[in-house]
A protein has these predicted regions:
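Short, surface-exposed acidic/glycine-rich loop or hinge patches that mediate macromolecular interfaces
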Residues: 66-69, 106, 234, 262-264, ...
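Primarily ABC-family ATPase nucleotide-binding module
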Residues: 1-3
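ABC transporter nucleotide-binding domain
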Residues: 171-261
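Short phosphate-engaging motifs
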Residues: 19, 108, 194, 235-237, ...
C-alpha cells in the first residue's frame, strides 16, 4: 500500500523547548492511522506542522510525493481537518452552514444533500448548530470537512467530550467514510480502547520521538500477557528458580502472585512447573495484552 503522507526527521521547538525530536511517520493511503501520545507529547504540534499552521524548522513532509517545503498548502488543498473543536457557525442552522460552503466551493445543492445523508443529519437540517448535542456537533463538523471531497481527514482528539453513545456513533461514521468513501483518516487520541477498535495503523509518540509505528496487532503481539493465581504461600515462589523462563511481575500478598508470559505454551509450562513442585494453585486469571497495556509499557 502506497503512502499518502510521509514525515521524515521532523523537529520543532517553542522558545527553546524542544517538542518534536526527529519524528518519522508513514501514513498508508486508505488507512485509519492513530497517533497516540500522552498530553504534551507533541501530537497537536505535529498536526499543526502538517497543515502548515507552523513553519517547518527541521525535517521534511511529503504529501503524494511532493515536498511541502516547496508547496506548503498542498496538503490543505486535498485534505480537511478538525482541530480540537468542530468548526461551524453556531447561529446558523445545519443547512445554512452547508449552504455557506456551497457558496465557496460551488459544488451544487446535490453535494449538500449527499453530505446531510452521509452524516445522518437530514432530521436536524433546520436546527441551529448551537442547539445540537455534542455528538451531532461532531457530525456537523465532519460534514463541513467532507463537503469538498477530501482525500484525507486530519482529526485532533475527535473523541473528546463525547459520551459513550457519541463515541460509538463517531467511530461508526469514521469507519464508513474510510471503507465506503476511501478517505484516509489521521487522528490523534488518548482514548486507547476506542482507537484499538478503529485504527489499523498506529504510531506512538513519547518525549517528542516516535517510539513505535506499525499495525496494532503487531504491537500487541510484542507485549506479554499476565497470568495471576492464588497459592497457599507465595514464599515458595522465590525458591523456584523460575527466573530464566518466566518473569515474576508481582507478589501481591501472602497468597497471590502474577507472572508475565509471552504465549499459551509458556502458560502451560508455568502451570506444569507449579504441579511439579506440588504447589496448589487456585483462581487462575489470564489477562491478554491490549493496546492500553502496550502503550503503558512503552511510555512508562
Amino acid at each position: 500500500m502506497a503512502n499518502i503522507l510521509s514525515v521524515r526527521g521532523l523537529s520543532f521547538g517553542y522558545q527553546g523547548n524542544q517538542v518534536l525530536r526527529g519524528v518519522d511517520l508513514e501514513i498508508p493511503q486508505g488507512s485509519i492511522f492513530g497517533y497516540l501520545g500522552k498530553n504534551g507529547a507533541g501530537k497537536s504540534t505535529t498536526i499543526k506542522l502538517l497543515l502548515g499552521l507552523l513553519p517547518i524548522e527541521e525535517g521534511e513532509i511529503f504529501f503524494r510525493g511532493v515536498n511541502l517545503r516547496e508547496a506548503p498548502l498542498l496538503l490543505r488543498s486535498y485534505s480537511s481537518s478538525m482541530i480540537e473543536h468542530p468548526f461551524f457557525y453556531p447561529f446558523l442552522t445545519v443547512s445554512e452552514n452547508l449552504d455557506y460552503l456551497d457558496h465557496i466551493f460551488r459544488l451544487g445543492k446535490g453535494r449538500k444533500k449527499e453530505v446531510l445523508s452521509l452524516m445522518g443529519l437530514n432530521d436536524h437540517a433546520n436546527k441551529r448548530a448551537q442547539s445540537l448535542s455534542s455528538g451531532l456537533k461532531q457530525r456537523l463538523g465532519l460534514a463541513m470537512c467532507l463537503f469538498n471531497h477530501p482525500e484525507m481527514l486530519i482529526l485532533d482528539e475527535p473523541l473528546n467530550a463525547l459520551d459513550p453513545q457519541g463515541i460509538y456513533e463517531l467511530r461508526s461514521i469514521l469507519k464508513m467514510l474510510n471503507q465506503e468513501e476511501g478517505v484516509t483518516i489521521f487522528l490523534s487520541s488518548h482514548i486507547l480502547e476506542e482507537l484499538e477498535k478503529l485504527a489499523d495503523h498506529v504510531a506512538i509518540i513519547h518525549g517528542g520521538k516516535v517510539i513505535y509505528q506499525g499495525d496494532i496487532s503487531g504491537l500487541i503481539k510484542k507485549q506479554s500477557n499476565i497470568v495471576k493465581f492464588k497459592i497457599d504461600n507465595t514464599s515458595i515462589i522465590t525458591q523456584l528458580g523460575y527466573d530464566s523462563k518466566f518473569s515474576l511481575v508481582e507478589i501481591h500478598d501472602a497468597n497471590h502472585v502474577s507472572f508475565e508470559i509471552r504465549n499459551e505454551n509458556e502458560f502451560a509450562q508455568l502451570i506444569a512447573l507449579m504441579s511439579q513442585e506440588r504447589i496448589a494453585i487456585y483462581n487462575i486469571t489470564y489477562q491478554e495484552s491490549a493496546l492500553e497495556t502496550a502503550f503503558i509499557h512503552l511510555t512508562e
